[in-house]
Amino acid sequence: MNKLILISLIASLYQVEVDAHGYMTFPIARQRRCSAAGGNWYPVGGGGIQDPMCRAAYQNVFNKVLNSNGGDVIDASEAANYMYTQDNEYAALAGPDYTNICHIQQRVVPSYLCAAGASDWSIRPFGDKSGMDLPGSWTPTIIQLSDNQQSNVVMELEFCPTAVHDPSYYEVYITNPSFNVYTDNVVWANLDLIYNNTVTLRPKLPESTCAANSMVYRFEVSIPVRPSQFVLYVRWQRIDPVGEGFYNCVDMKFKYSEGPDEEDIIEPEYEVDNEAECFAYRTNSGNVNVNPLQENKYMAYANKAIRNINTHSNGCSRNRNNKNNYNKYYSKTYNYNQNRK
């Protein structure tokens, strides 16, 4: 009976209206895949979540908040569930300088990219979504290649807006060929820009999984073929003085007919469940055992990413090559915004 009361109390915390925004539905965003699968409400602590990485993400935040807040289970549950209930608000505010990509990389979302930079439960409304940034065997959307010699695949992506924000534009990045989803965090240093343009609302297709709107953002992107699992990083940026942007990690994998060369494939060096447990704090029979070694390792990854932003070949320094494109795009979007006033 006490468990039912606790679950009801936790669930009641979410019976409020939120300013909803959206998420990738094809390929599906990491956080949306987890929230759609469910299992996060019971039992407390995330034991009902079937997907090992979704469970690790939940437990990572749950135990972090639990250990920093004097063992408040309700607060820890609220924090962890926030990653699920707020799957349409993986967002950050850039202010009027939102076209400055170095500003985005250094100040707006410098780390925890899959969480849109949200890593502190005390900061609302974004909270702590950092569990979504754990390296590991995330379930990917698998795309069959029609030809094993393909270097690029043109795909139509779909973003489901739970609230429409126009004018706006999209950027799509892809992790570079050396990225290892099992051990590497998604950081700006290992991302390459492959798409940057405005996108208009269009009717959703019959096979769409977007239930929140009859209109979606659909746009074609030429995606470089990667021999191993990779991540698309999608930024949906509003054109307004507040500079609200939405950031989604999308796990993907291309399927070869005969398979790529073995030396090109990156495979995990560990059992998936064991590694997922290493990155999450452990909960056994209500007793929480902190694993500070792994937490320090994870934070070291994030801090290194921040330090490397200005110097890495794929960090801000590389964006001078795109400076003219950004300046040109800023002028276009600024004029568009002015004409709509």
Curated annotation (Swiss-Prot):
<dbReference type="Pfam" id="PF03067">
    <property type="entry name" value="LPMO_10"/>
</dbReference>
<dbReference type="InterPro" id="IPR051024">
    <property type="entry name" value="GlcNAc_Chitin_IntDeg"/>
</dbReference>
<dbReference type="InterPro" id="IPR014756">
    <property type="entry name" value="Ig_E-set"/>
</dbReference>
<feature type="signal peptide">
    <location>
        <begin position="1"/>
        <end position="20"/>
    </location>
</feature>
<dbReference type="InterPro" id="IPR004302">
    <property type="entry name" value="Cellulose/chitin-bd_N"/>
</dbReference>
<comment type="subunit">
    <text>Homodimer; disulfide-linked.</text>
</comment>
<keyword id="KW-1015">Disulfide bond</keyword>
<keyword id="KW-0732">Signal</keyword>
<protein>
    <recommendedName>
        <fullName>Spindolin</fullName>
    </recommendedName>
</protein>
<keyword id="KW-0426">Late protein</keyword>
<comment type="function">
    <text>This protein is a spindle body protein.</text>
</comment>
